[in-house]
């Protein structure tokens, strides 16, 4: 997301090599940035790799805009990322967590996460317009996501980027890539629960399925707190994520 790109630039790129002119960047500067992220900030190789990819993309855009003639990152080498296996709930653990959830909003959230693979922003930004029918089957046509953006991040978005304020610091944006826009057929039991939930709670003014009692959008921070409570409820530690 654009918010993530801006954050990476501010936290990892500028402090390390922000004083260097674009047309003077060399492979040594990229290595300096990698050392800054990993040695001085104590971050992982994955974070260093994210900074490198973000800068590479920014420089590629600078070439297209005619700001510089070539992308100096082409001669550099991306940091080697040490692969770390993510902890994942077993199907039995996921079923127990869902069954133990006492709030119908979050029970449905966890069901969507585990049964469809929908990402956090896609679930938080789910709208009535994304619900379609294919014969008797209900389909979610993922076209939007909801993400938290600061005023500065919104002002820094390139022209043409679709970004609609939803309230509570949340904005409706398109998925990062075309692959993110996809159709997800729902199992009948999940479809029935989703439609029943909408019947009980209705949409907010922006058509969001998930919102609080006052129609305010839910945020990733709220989900994270509820997720940890759900893990605690079934005796699991916090190493697991709702996308596992």
Would you name each region that the model predicts?
Residues 8, 29, 50-54, 93, ...:
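Charged catalytic carboxylate motif
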């Amino acid at each position: 997301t654009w918010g993530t790109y801006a954050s990476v630039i501010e936290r990892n790129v500028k402090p390390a090599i922000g004083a260097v002119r674009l047309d003077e960047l060399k492979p040594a500067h990229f290595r300096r940035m990698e050392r800054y992220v990993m040695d001085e900030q104590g971050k992982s190789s994955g974070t260093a790799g994210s900074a490198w990819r973000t800068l590479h993309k920014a420089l590629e855009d600078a070439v297209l805009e005619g700001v510089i003639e070539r992308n100096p990152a082409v001669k550099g080498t991306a940091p080697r990322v040490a692969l770390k296996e993510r902890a994942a709930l077993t199907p039995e653990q996921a079923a127990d967590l869902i069954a133990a959830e006492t709030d119908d909003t979050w029970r449905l959230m966890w069901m969507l996460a585990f049964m469809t693979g929908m990402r956090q922003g896609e679930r938080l930004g789910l709208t009535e317009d994304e619900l379609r029918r294919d014969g008797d089957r209900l389909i979610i046509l993922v076209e939007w996501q909801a993400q938290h953006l600061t005023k500065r991040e919104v002002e820094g978005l390139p022209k043409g980027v679709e970004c609609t304020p939803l309230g509570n610091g949340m904005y409706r944006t398109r998925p990062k890539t075309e692959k993110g826009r996809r159709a997800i057929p729902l199992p009948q039991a999940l479809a029935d629960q989703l439609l029943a939930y909408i019947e009980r709670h209705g949409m907010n003014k922006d058509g969001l399925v998930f919102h609080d009692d006052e129609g305010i959008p839910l945020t990733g921070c709220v989900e994270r707190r509820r997720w940890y409570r759900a893990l605690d409820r079934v005796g699991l530690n916090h190493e697991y994520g709702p996308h596992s």
